[in-house]
Amino acid sequence: MSATAKKSAAQLQREEEEARKKLKRLSKQGGVEGRLPMKRLFRQRAHANVLSDHELEYPRSPSEMDWSPYYPDFDVESNKKVEIVDIGCGYGGLTVALGPQFPDTLVLGMEIRMQVSDYLKEKIQALRYRADHEEPVPGGYKNISVLRMNCQKFLPNFFEKGQLSKMFFCFPDPHFKARKHKNRIITSTLASEYAYFIRPHGTLYTITDVEELHVWMAQHLDAHPLFRRFTKEEEENDICVTLMTNETEEGKKVARNGGKKFVACYERIPNPK
């Protein structure tokens, strides 16, 4: 048996944590500017329990949220607000891809898992450095950020009515057991909440590799009076559909394994008069 095999899970976790701390110290000392973080040092279980208590900080209302630490290069006085949100962004493949595509728009990835959100935070810092010193890109990744948060509880603390133009739900936890279906990210109640945040003619995007979950999400959104499902032609002509299909880590994994991806997108229609 190898030495690695003999190590306990706790020992491996401690070693990985020490390695992460070392990298962070080097980064602060200027030793690894522009170096992308190693994903293996930020591994965590695929999903988190949204009903568990997490040590999270959130404002009492959207007006009390200070976004300047997240978007330090944007003029706070201009009152620019987050418009695109990647819910459960994971390691940030889509969040990062959206940045150059919408360089004048603030994009936010929201992720409940601490290790994963820490990874994306460091990745964004490295990408910003590279954009400034090596490979310029539109927006320089200064318009993207990540926030560790439970999106099924605290979105009203961050976003106002009609603030968002796009919301993405990419490869969410399928919660296979029937008793867990109430914890799914798309429900009738949550669909109404999302309709509150998305402005008229904004878009809600979903993608999953689990057909049963795809049917569930589509049924709930189809039934909602404020959402209209995209036609296939509309999906094919939307660059964001291409990005969420090809740029997310889960999407790439599904492609490598030869799996299927199920997409459903919805326009937020105006409130009836």
Curated annotation (Swiss-Prot):
Residues 1-32 are annotated as: Disordered. CDD domains: AdoMet_MTases. The active site is at D173. One of its GO terms (biological process) is tRNA methylation. Keywords: Methyltransferase, Nucleus, RNA-binding, S-adenosyl-L-methionine, Transferase, tRNA processing, tRNA-binding. It is found in: Nucleus. SUPFAM superfamilies: S-adenosyl-L-methionine-dependent methyltransferases (SSF53335). S-adenosyl-L-methionine binds at G88, E111, I112, N150, C151, C170, T248, E249, E250. Its EC number is 2.1.1.33. Pathway: tRNA modification; N(7)-methylguanine-tRNA biosynthesis. It is an enzyme of class 2 (transferase). Pfam families: Methyltransf_4. One of its GO terms (cellular component) is nucleolus. One of its GO terms (molecular function) is tRNA (guanine(46)-N7)-methyltransferase activity. It catalyses: guanosine(46) in tRNA + S-adenosyl-L-methionine = N(7)-methylguanosine(46) in tRNA + S-adenosyl-L-homocysteine. The keyword RNA-binding applies. PANTHER family: 3-DEOXY-D-MANNO-OCTULOSONIC-ACID TRANSFERASE/TRNA GUANINE-N 7 - -METHYLTRANSFERASE, TRNA (GUANINE-N(7)-)-METHYLTRANSFERASE. Belongs to the class I-like SAM-binding methyltransferase superfamily. TrmB family. NCBIfam families: tRNA (guanosine(46)-N7)-methyltransferase TrmB. Forms a complex with trm82. Catalyzes the formation of N(7)-methylguanine at position 46 (m7G46) in tRNA. This is tRNA (guanine-N(7)-)-methyltransferase. The gene is trm8.
